[in-house]
Amino acid sequence: LDMPSGSFRTLEEALRRVFQMSVDKHMMFIIDDYPALVDTAPQVPILLRELMETYRDYGKMLVLLMGTHVDELKGRILGESSLIAPYIHSHFKVEPFTLDDVRALGWNYTDEDLAKLYHVTGGMPGNLVHIDPTESIDDNIVRLFFRPEGALYMEPQRLLMRYIRNAGAANAILYALAQLDKPFYTELCHASELKSGTFATRMADLLDMAIIGRLQGGSRGPLRYSDYHFVNTMFQFWFEYVFPYMEDIHCGDGQHVYDTIVKPVFTKNLSLVY
């Protein structure tokens, strides 16, 4: 793979060099977190629009823009205010793997271990890439979640802070949900200790991000009596077993937390993913 060489004084110089290379060869240009790039460099949509227009007829470039939160990505790319919407040919959402998809990876784990792995990663391909199949499931979990330098140790917080204005309120809701068994709306609001307006706004955010979901039972009456539950099992695992023990993990006691607190009771949640 030939990459642009040399140094570039500006982002514009680098982008122009990449697009110029596409005149002579077919290329795919991937921006891993487009919303974050635009937040850091607001001129990017203008540059991309100009370059896409300039090289539309003779460039051989496929540009792939990626992001974590689908609705925000759609707004940035496909919305009426998007500068590059006319150049977008298609969009798609990468769904979490199923448990069968994880089995198909061919890793030498038992079904119970694969269920653990699926639960802690939420089945997301971006999380599964951090799994080392030469290690035990327990060692993988400790390395990723129970060490301050772990690749997934702060991942739920990073996502909340990236896409929710008041991440502290979201933390309160998710921690309360992790302690309760499919609570009603009012039960969850009370447990979170948030004001009703703040609670309602953050609940809408979490539902929109598919971190939590609601299931209305036939005998439970109005929607406010729906059962609330985690949809993203990585968030469930994190708020149940990592969030309450972050101080211990920062002090280097993550292995002890996992061995004595998490591992003995962890399997009780595995029925959620079978």
Q: Over which residues does each language-model region extend?
A:
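Inter-domain helical "communication" segments and dimerization helices
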Residues: D2-E12, L73, E247-Y258
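Mid-core helix/loop region of P-loop NTP-binding domains shared across ATPases and GTPases
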Residues: D2-I31, A36-L37, L51-L62
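Sensor-1/coupling segment of RecA-like P-loop NTPase cores
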Residues: M28, A36-S81
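Conserved nucleotide-binding/hydrolysis micro-motifs of P-loop NTPases
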Residues: A36, T68-L73, T98-D100, P125, ...
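Conserved small helical "lid"/interfacial subdomain of P-loop NTPases
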Residues: I88-L114
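The alpha-helix within a helix-turn-helix
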Residues: R103, Y118, C189
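Accessory nucleic acid-recognition modules appended to NTPase machines
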Residues: N127, I131-P133, I137-Y274
